[in-house]
């Protein structure tokens, strides 16, 4: 349970109204919401308006303040379909002026509450300032950030760099564990990794929508899709988010994980340490370990719900731990002419 109450915006599925609710736990917010909307608490649950993710007590602390939630009763479902609409619309580079005007007209004429809600949500999401890039173009997006960040791409690039740097700091804490004899080799490997990371700008391009296609994890408009748990090929829930769209999505994106498929702390670093200790004249393939630790070769971008914290039980490839040893060809003796 949180010490300080978290404030959220809450709506019921079939209600045009939206209320502010505060609570220290998911259950407290649910109880207050049911009282407010006069709905039965039994069988009811909360989910994110953004993508339909169901809230649990473990996930509740990660939800940003003023996040928009939907209160569902038994049998109701919310798929976050507006996200799919928004993703489709954002594929166009020009503002959807005609579409906005048409939706506004439909909203004026529409009497059915559910259709009114859908049209209102559509207008809200189409009107978001996704295309804006600078602080001057979208000041609310930058609220709470240091003044040195003047562009959305710049901040998100920094955010990704910070994650990669934290992995490097973790590796850097291990030289003392390998013993005096192997420390020099460990520092050599670490130095090579640092040099590569600096040249790649700590792979910050992964979160930069302005980067080249092969070096970013999002669309040119800034849409990220969850790549699914480490043991699956894709995300069955089709989680997606655009942290470039608004401040709330930017904050929510910070809860997404860059998950190591082969685990960093349990497997990769211990294997690297052991390889350096036991190299016996062989050369450790630092580029292989670099790829596992710092690149999308072994990193998956996942929604917090798809981030499984169980032991992955995956190992490094034994054939790639050391560089192949080159054998010198023996010179054939020169035959004497008869």
From Swiss-Prot:
Superkingdom, taxonomy of origin: Eukaryota
UniProt keyword annotation of Ribosomal protein present: no
GO cellular component, one term: nucleoplasm
Segments passing through the bilayer: none
Entry's localization field: Cytoplasm; Nucleus
GO biological process, one term: DNA catabolic process
Matches recorded under InterPro entries: CIDE-N_dom, DFF40, DFF40_C, His-Me_finger_sf
EC number: 3.-.-.-
Alphabetized UniProt keyword annotations: Apoptosis, Cytoplasm, Hydrolase, Nuclease, Nucleus
Activity control, per UniProt: Inhibited by DFFA (DFF45).
CIDE-N domain span: 4-80
Hydrolase among keywords: yes
Recorded GO MF terms: disordered domain specific binding; DNA binding; DNA endonuclease activity; DNA nuclease activity; enzyme binding; identical protein binding; protein domain specific binding
Role noted for this protein: Nuclease that induces DNA fragmentation and chromatin condensation during apoptosis. Degrades naked DNA and induces apoptotic morphology.
Subunit structure as annotated in this protein's UniProt entry: Heterodimer of DFFA and DFFB. Interacts with H1-1.
This protein's name: DNA fragmentation factor subunit beta
């Amino acid at each position: 349970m949180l010490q300080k109450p978290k404030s959220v915006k809450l709506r019921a599925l079939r209600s045009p109204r939206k209320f502010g609710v505060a609570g220290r736990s998911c259950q407290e917010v649910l109880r207050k919401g049911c009282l407010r909307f006069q709905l039965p608490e039994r069988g009811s649950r909360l989910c994110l308006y953004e993508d339909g993710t169901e809230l649990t007590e473990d996930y509740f602390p990660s939800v940003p303040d003023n996040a928009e939630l939907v209160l569902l009763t038994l049998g109701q479902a919310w798929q976050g379909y507006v996200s799919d609409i928004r993703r489709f619309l954002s594929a166009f580079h020009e503002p959807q002026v005609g579409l906005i005007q048409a939706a506004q007209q439909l909203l004026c004429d529409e009497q059915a509450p559910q259709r009114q809600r859908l049209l209102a949500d559509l207008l809200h999401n189409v009107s978001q300032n996704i295309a804006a890039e600078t602080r001057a173009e979208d000041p609310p997006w930058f609220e709470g950030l240091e003044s040195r960040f003047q562009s959305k791409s710049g901040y998100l690039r920094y955010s990704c760099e910070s994650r990669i740097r934290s992995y490097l700091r973790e590796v850097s804490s291990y030289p003392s564990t390998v013993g005096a004899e192997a420390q020099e080799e460990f520092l050599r490997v670490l130095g090579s990794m640092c040099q590569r990371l600096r040249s790649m700008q700590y792979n910050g391009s992964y979160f930069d929508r302005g980067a080249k296609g092969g070096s970013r994890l999002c669309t040119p408009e800034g849409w990220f899709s969850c790549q699914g748990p480490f043991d699956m090929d894709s995300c069955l829930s089709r989680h997606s988010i655009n942290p470039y769209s608004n401040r709330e999505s930017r904050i929510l994106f910070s809860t997404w994980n860059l998950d190591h498929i082969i685990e960093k702390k349990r497997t990769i670093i211990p294997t690297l340490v052991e390889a350096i200790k036991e190299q016996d004249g062989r050369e450790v393939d630092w580029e292989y370990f670099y790829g596992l630790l710092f690149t999308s070769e072994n990193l998956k971008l996942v929604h917090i719900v798809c981030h499984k914290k169980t032991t992955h039980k995956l190992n490094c490839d034994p054939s790639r731990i050391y560089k192949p040893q080159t054998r010198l060809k023996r010179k054939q003796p020169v035959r004497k002419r008869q």
